[in-house]
């Protein structure tokens, strides 16, 4: 979800309002309903209100300062809800499992977005970027318990950083020198660290 939101806000900030609107529809329509039972089970009210407020502000093409505030409110609400996860999910190894799962989604999205270096679906290309940015953000914010974990984290971050060349711009034009196999190879490399 954070991937869709990140890309939507970046597109909005850069003046691509129609593209931003598409990405703001995804989280509510595709993802939020699936996690409502988890919120109920954990005794959380979720973040539907904040998600709606951001989507509405984007739809109404409000000033970017307001969009930025609504985005911050939403990401803060998501962070609060993430605190309901159990302690074992906070370990570096579990964070890396999450990073790999986000990269797997990014690879799927990129494969739909870029086919034989041609832009087939710019929205999926953008989603793949969002998932990759969020994967890096999760790992960057992860703590480590010892030198070995610190080394593992840093090596994984180097692999993640190497992927950003796959997105030369937010709105792809012409040929894109990228392939989803690069993301899949990065996953294999991360798993071997």
What is the role of each PLM region?
Residues 1-193:
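Mature extracytoplasmic or organellar-lumen-exposed domains after removal of signal/transit peptides
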């Amino acid at each position: 979800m954070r991937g869709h939101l990140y890309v939507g806000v970046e597109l909005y900030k850069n003046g691509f309002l129609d593209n931003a609107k598409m990405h703001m529809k995804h989280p509510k329509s595709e993802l939020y309903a699936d996690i409502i039972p988890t919120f109920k089970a954990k005794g959380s009210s979720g973040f539907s209100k904040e998600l709606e407020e951001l989507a509405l502000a984007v739809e109404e093409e409000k000033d970017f300062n307001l969009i930025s505030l609504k985005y911050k409110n939403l990401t803060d609400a998501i962070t609060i809800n993430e605190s309901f996860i159990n302690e074992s999910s906070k370990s570096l190894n579990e964070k890396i499992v999450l990073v790999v799962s986000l990269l797997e989604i990014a690879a799927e999205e990129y494969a739909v977005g870029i086919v034989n270096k041609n832009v087939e679906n710019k929205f999926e290309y953008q989603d793949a970027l969002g998932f990759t940015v969020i994967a890096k953000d999760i790992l960057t914010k992860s703590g480590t318990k010892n030198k070995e974990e610190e080394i593992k984290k840093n090596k994984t971050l180097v692999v993640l950083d190497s992927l950003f060349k796959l997105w030369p711009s937010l709105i792809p034009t012409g040929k894109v020198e990228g392939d989803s196999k690069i993301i899949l190879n990065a996953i294999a490399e991360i798993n071997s660290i």
